[in-house]
């Protein structure tokens, strides 16, 4: 029997509105190949995504800025102009021609934006962040703590970007809530030291992310929406002392707010941004199992990413109901390794 016939990784699964033929997902990968001035995806992006599409497979796009002011990184595509929407439509058409599905990852940088690119670097709180600690040559940004008016405006950006995604032919969206970017900055005390209704207790720190989630779900339907989290990552100055004390309640809050959500996408503890430590000795509480248990009690699907190989993905899928997202293996093309997708 073939690998495809003998492993759960290649069994069909319904994720929100889409009926997938297997559980192998393209993880969002920052490519930085868009036009530097217009943030329009490059013409060859359609070929890039089509190469990674498969019949009944799910791709999650590179992070895509929801508005110009949400950016602050060069050559990253946007989804806030008609020119950008038209360019993305050629990409989604190419994926659909291969029988695949594609979700757009909606992205806002927050305090890690480059101040040379955007006039205001927005932040959840006033906790200093030194970009040089991540290997960047940029000095620490002078950022602006978001007011309630700013927060409401950004919620509107997310909502409009979700609508633009559907216009561009995407099958859904993933809200980027991981890796120390804006939504993650509200969730964690490493960056959120606010004393108003958006800071302090978990309920307050969840307020902005939930507003975004609810606005996006209202705009395009919860079965077209996923959200990403990275509970254990130290990337960009993040990580709570007790990550699960934040992210288990966060998963519960997500599912309570949107029980028909398509998926929650979590990053494994061995990953921090673009770096991984496959042989790292994990602490006892460094485990996605408690979050998986929360998600497993609902209709929401659970996607995991971080350092998987074809062999470990097959073993993981056999033990769980998870979908497994690959990044670097998709760059090298899984099909070159005889993966049956």
Where in this protein do the model-derived segments appear?
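Flavin-dependent oxidoreductase catalytic cores
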Residues: 1-341
